Structure formats: structure tokens, C-alpha cells
């Protein structure tokens, strides 16, 4: 029988960090209170969001659609990247997944996930 007090596996939350997200501050308070282990952020690289999550060991992966956004996210403190390449749903990029990964790996050796055209 499952024990509800024992975590089954790491989980993550998606946080849209664009300034138009009026729930972000409250959602982050709840996530930090419960020490969410992994965040996937999108639509803006915000240092204060990364700092809040990392204050207890949380990991932040940021959705990016090109190399410029990747560099911005890492410079603001993201731990890793989700490369949303051509063929992905939602706010997809226009670059081939193989080209995008290669561009990013030229300067970044941290966690890198790929989304789209797989």
C-alpha cells in the first residue's frame, strides 16, 4: 500500500513568469512553502524567481526558443534549459531541434532538455 507521506518521485511545476501573470507571486509563495523540487519557467527570465526556488535547493529549467533567450535565462540564474524547437506546440521556436541543441552546447554544458520535432 502506498504511503502518502513518502514522495513517489520528483515533480515539477510550470510557472509563466511574464509580468502579466497576476498569480505568480502567490503561486511562488505556495511553491516555496512546499519546496517544489523542479520548476519549468517560461515567457521571461526573472532572477527573483530563480533565487526563490534555489533558496532551498529547487532547480529551475527555462523554456527557450533560440540561443539569445537561452543565454539570457542562464545569465539570470536558470539552472538549465528546455529548448522548444520547431515543431513543438505552444510558443515554439523556428529552429531545427538539432541546430538549436548544437548552438547551445557550444557555450552551455548544464542540463538541457529538448522539445519539438522529436
Residue locations for each model-derived region?
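Active-site entrance/lid segments in N-terminal catalytic domains of soluble metabolic enzymes
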Residues: 1-113
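A short glycine-centered flexible hinge/capping loop motif at secondary-structure junctions
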Residues: 115-118
Amino acid at each position: 500500500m502506498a504511503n502518502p507521506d513518502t514522495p513517489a518521485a520528483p515533480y515539477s511545476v510550470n510557472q509563466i513568469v511574464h509580468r502579466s501573470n497576476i498569480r505568480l507571486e502567490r503561486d511562488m509563495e505556495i511553491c516555496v512553502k512546499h519546496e517544489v523540487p523542479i520548476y519549468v519557467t517560461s515567457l521571461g527570465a526573472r532572477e527573483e524567481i530563480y533565487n526563490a526556488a534555489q533558496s532551498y535547493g529547487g532547480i529551475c529549467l527555462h523554456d527557450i526558443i533560440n540561443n539569445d533567450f537561452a543565454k539570457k535565462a542562464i545569465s539570470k540564474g536558470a539552472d538549465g534549459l528546455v529548448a522548444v524547437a520547431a515543431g513543438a506546440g505552444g510558443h515554439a521556436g523556428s529552429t531545427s531541434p538539432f541546430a538549436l541543441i548544437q548552438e547551445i552546447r557550444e557555450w552551455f554544458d548544464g542540463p538541457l532538455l529538448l522539445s519539438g520535432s522529436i
